[in-house]
Amino acid sequence: MEHPLNIYNTLTRKKEQFIPLHEPHVGMYVCGPTVYGDAHLGHARPAITFDLLFRYLTHLGYKVRYVRNITDVGHLEHDADDGEDKIAKKARLEQLEPMEVVQYYLNRYHQAMDALNVLPPSIEPHASGHIIEQIELVKKILDNGYAYESQGSVYFDVEKYNKDHKYGILSGRNIEDMLNTTRALDGQDEKHNAIDFALWKCAQPEHIMRWPSPWSDGFPGWHCECTAMGKKYLGEHFDIHGGGMDLIFPHHECEIAQAVASQGDDMVHYWMHNNMITINGQKMGKSLGNFITLEQFFTGDHPSLQQAYSAMTIRFFILQAHYRSTVDFSNEALQAAEKGLSRLMEAYGHLMKLQPSATSTVDTKGLREKCFEAMNDDLNSPIVISHLFDATRAINSVKDGKATLSEEDLKELQEVFHLFLFDILGMKDEASASGNHYEAFGKAVDLLLSIRQQAKANKDWATSDKIRNELTAMGFEIKDTKDGAEWKLSK
């Protein structure tokens, strides 16, 4: 490829050049949501992070098969091996079938992802649709001697596995420390060690979600689904596995152990993890009850929110930080993101209307290369955005008549701005995204301003002022320029 991409591999703890196993094909698996409630800001971050990667790999010419799963069974409370299934609990509380809960929140998740301009994955498999594959995985691990059956459940034997391999290779945790510090919880005396994790759980009589297996009527452990579905759709070895940093342990650590125990080696070449969204310094999440849903951001209906924020403001807010750095929620940061995005969108609008000159007095030639350089440095989206802001200053100088752009440079700047702002960063002009209604609405405002312009030419100041004052009262900002009046909706 013309542009070598380097990404940070959590497994090796360093940036590495991305070399696909089967170029030009790329296999990418990302852990999706457990659908028992509305998506919140913490769900938006991995979705947007790996959407950025998906878009960029596609732009570089790779043929990406992007698999993002839906967890609809087996994810117990507190991410543990005991307690109630999160979806079954929600179903019981709302007196619904578990799959009604799944479908309702999955529909709402998709709506939120559409609003955030997150592209759909190539495949979106459900854990409940792959029980057979998970049972086969458990059988292989048992046959290879790294699991044991106990009272109808099957557990992964971490201590035995660690004698032949290395448990903790991803998270850097030491098994001796874990053996000494992990306490056995009530109801887990069927395990050899407290750190052993469930591959299959025997269902209690009241447990609704259950399937027959060689060991009992039950359900798979949470960690099995990604190993089984990753293998089914991407093969025994694939390029990228992504997810939030909170999944490194235990979920992804257990996935590596399952893969090695079942087939002799890890399935994944590059492990990638986005950092957390925090609120008052704590991870935002359902389990802590400190989350704000995306719907609440879009409507402003939450006591912590000073206003509503658009989906593109949320996306821009997340992309303004590098995906491996923490992002702390605040109204001030979101309002700054809103203003910054508005500046870029306005600049793009001006850019598309600029007229070329014979020569250029501003240098735009390095912009494309600088943006690619930032993206190739582990998807450094904040640096890309800073380069676009630099270009915005040049655009405004040309617009104000203080600088010029040749036809060639103008075309290059238009192409690069569009490529990075829309195609790669995945932003969209929310005003124009509403389609024909907005177009008709815009034409109506333009018509009023042309009538005002004619009134000014006729020295009919009363009509001119009336149109301006009425539009201002409705929330429009009117700016008179040498080329006529410009307008935008003010906040």
Curated annotation (Swiss-Prot):
**Entry GO terms, CC:** cytosol
Where is ATP annotated to bind? K286
Which CDD domains does UniProt cross-reference here?
CysRS_core
Q: Which UniProt keywords apply?
A: Aminoacyl-tRNA synthetase, ATP-binding, Cytoplasm, Ligase, Metal-binding, Nucleotide-binding, Protein biosynthesis, Zinc
UniProt main location, coarse: cytoplasm
Looking at the keywords, is Membrane present? no
Q: Which reaction does it catalyse?
A: tRNA(Cys) + L-cysteine + ATP = L-cysteinyl-tRNA(Cys) + AMP + diphosphate
Enzyme Commission number: 6.1.1.16
* Residues spanned by motif 'KMSKS' region: 283-287
UniProt cofactor note: Binds 1 zinc ion per subunit.
Q: Which domain of life is it from?
A: Bacteria
Note the InterPro entries from the entry.
Cys-tRNA-ligase, Cys-tRNA-synt_Ia_DALR, Cys-tRNA/MSH_ligase, CysS_C, Rossmann-like_a/b/a_fold, tRNA-synt_1_cat_dom, tRNAsynth_Ia_anticodon-bd
Name its co-factor(s). Zn(2+)
Short sequence motif 'HIGH' region: positions: 33-43
The entry's localization annotation reads: Cytoplasm
Statement: the UniProt record of this protein carries the keyword Ligase: yes
The EC class name is ligase
Could you mention a single GO BP entry for this protein?
Answer: cysteinyl-tRNA aminoacylation
For Zn(2+), which residues are the binding ones? C31, C226, H251, E255
Q: Kindly give the Pfam families that the UniProt entry links to this protein.
A: CysS_C, DALR_2, tRNA-synt_1e
The GO terms this record gives for MF are:
ATP binding; cysteine-tRNA ligase activity; zinc ion binding
- Give the protein family: Belongs to the class-I aminoacyl-tRNA synthetase family.
Cite the record's note on assembly: Monomer.
Q: Quote the protein name from its UniProt record.
A: Cysteine--tRNA ligase
Query: What does the record give as the organism's lineage?
Result: Bacteria, Pseudomonadati, Bacteroidota, Bacteroidia, Bacteroidales
Q: Which gene encodes it?
A: cysS
